[in-house]
Amino acid sequence: MSDRQAAEGPAFWSPAARRGSAGGVGDRRGVEESQAAASEKEDLESTNVSSPLASASDPAAESSPYRPQMVSPASKDTTEDLQNVAGASEGQAPGEQAALPAGQTQVLSEMAKYQAPQRPEDTVMIQSEHTGAIDVLSADLESADLLGDHRKVSPPLMAPPCVWTFAKVKEFKSKLGKEKNSRLVVKRGEVVTIRVPTHPEGKRVCWEFATDDYDIGFGVYFDWTPVTSTDITVQVSDSSEDEEEEEDEEEEIEEPVPVGDVERGSRSSLRGRYGEVMPVYRRDSHRDVQAGSHDYPGEGIYLLKFDNSYSLLRNKTLYFHIYYTS
């Protein structure tokens, strides 16, 4: 082989090449067509083997059909997972957040309970059917009391009474037995209430009482109501519950209805006017004279209750003396 053949290589001086170069135009065209078919087949194989992720991210893969890219099965699975995540994120709303852990969700729900809603203040207009006056109430309906807050104000606390006893029961009963309106009989199952108004010239109320043979229940209460008369009156009821109902009905009739009041209050609101000076307890008034006094807390009526509702068999003879001092 000559030096020229060795330099140009065996492919240049092969018989097929020499035939192509020495042959006609038809032989050269056949060789070119066979090379083009081989290139198209190679392009098709490289397209099937390359991954979708590489073809989408690498622009050189589309411009270089002669560069095959091999992708392992694990890489193909990873690519599919990434595509699924991307599709889910695109379908999610712009302002929507990902699901939070269970613990954090519970904390946020607890914090939401303490966020007070902001809303405008409610306004209520009440027109009187009698006077035509219009009252405008601007307040929160959840906390406003349309039944009259002025009647539900707690009365002032009562000062404790001063109580004592003395043993001269016979002398006491003998003296009061001769006086008028100082002796009465409390029948079995009854409650007697002696109503004693405050006196303009007095500063405290005093009481003394005793009974024959058996004890009796006794308690003192105060009714914060205007005094129209200083006369002492006696009220008798079958039981303590019946007496309270009668007092409530009487107060509902006597008390004027304020303008703009949409409804009457319940009995509990009316009972808020009463202050307890001394609760009802059974007293050994058949052994010792029970006595006591209480300073006036203001204008009102004292209610001295003699309770025999617990006795089903015996009547109680009561001797009492009630007066005021200055």
From Swiss-Prot:
**Which keywords does this Swiss-Prot/TrEMBL entry list?**
Acetylation
Family matches, as Pfam families: GOLD_2 (PF13897)
Which domain of life, per UniProt? Eukaryota
**Which residues does the UniProt record annotate as the domain GOLD?**
160-324
Disulfide pattern: none
* UniProt region (Disordered), positions on chain: 1-99, 234-268
Q: Which residues carry this modification: N6-acetyllysine?
A: K170
Residue spans of biased composition, Acidic residues class: 239-255
Regions of biased composition (Low complexity) lie at: 50-65
Would you tell me the protein name for this molecule?
A: Protein TMED8
- Per the UniProt record, the source organism is Mus musculus
